[in-house]
Amino acid sequence: MTINFKDLIYPKVSRLKMNDFQDLDHIEGVSISITCANLYKKPRDDLVMFYFRDGANYASVYTQSKIVSENIKWNLNIKSKKIKSLIINARNANAFTGLEGYKGLKEIAEETSLLLSKKQKEDENYPKNISPNEIIFGCTGTIGEKYPTQKIKESIPILVDKIKYTQNKLIWMKAALGIMTTDLKPKLVMEECEIGKKKVKIYGIAKGSGMIFPNMATTLGYIFTDADLSNDILNELLKKNIETTFNAISTDGDTSTNDMVSIFSTGKVKNSKIKNINDKKIKNFNGALHSVLLNLSKRVVADGEGASKFITINVIKSKNEKDAKKIAFSIANSNLVKTAIAGEDPNWGRIIMAIGKSGINIDLKKLSINFGNIKIIDKGQLVNNYKESEVANYMKQQTIDISVSLNTGQKKFTAYTMDLTKKYIEINADYRT
């Protein structure tokens, strides 16, 4: 993978690809290391370590697939309240690898804990021994291939030796690049806000381009904050905000075995203690976290495999959110809808089809459909002044908004997706060749 860093650091802004990279800098309590473990045929950074020298509170949400990767199993077995390290590898999903894949993670965790404990003794006034049970993993890549335990294990000393206690934009970007697979762009986002009167940072990176359909998080996403928040508060905040962000996107309707989104709190900013998420002091943080998650999830869609258009689907005035969500994803996951949009064909009949197959009862006399600001269906009827040429012209845009109004209540749901192009087929047909 050849990356032009000049293009990344000084990008030409494109709304579709969302490649305006933000200036993530230092966040207290987070250390980063990146290396090449030679997991790909051609050398590239493919192994990333986040090290929390004083530990970090954390929370995660994982895939709801009935077949999960070995790293998800490992992470679910971790009961430590604080995490000392997160290790992420690209190229290999460690899924459908069985006991051998799990034992590989155990070996890597044991090696990492020994070396990080040694580093603690070298660098800290009050060193602590680090346990393998304080290390979690993210894996992404091909399913079913033997996990490269030895290559990763041999790279751990290099990672530990290269740990950077102070970060800058380049280090964060290299970390985001290191976890990419078929992604074309690294995904980095930041927000700053206040808890009480204390300013805190929220940084996030993610990867994802294909095999994305929500059932919790739909990709790999990692959020870091210097705020002081408990595991319980982090868990509640993450689950609350994931539903309308990472759980609102789809590129191809396929749910991965490896999905995870995690949030880590280093506690370096001594903000007011938050006992529940209804505390007014956490309101700004909650909003900023939602912004980070939504921004990252939209970037995943915009960078979808072969994507040429970013599609927003708003289902409004529904009697409940569940129905709105089901209809939104029935449209978002329709290959006929997605190919029509790729071909810039104003075939609104495919939207009707997708609404109908959702299984939700529809009062046609109340149904309205808009493409952007152009009303197509009003109260179940094609509008009298409908001009297909006007809609066809709208379809040439890179961002397409579809609005479906059920007019049966006040609930709503927004889904985000991409078009389906020949390039998507090429990418996935050639994925392993």
What does each model-identified segment do?
Residues T2-E107, S113-T433:
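A structural signal for small-residue-enriched, beta-sheet-centric alpha/beta enzyme cores
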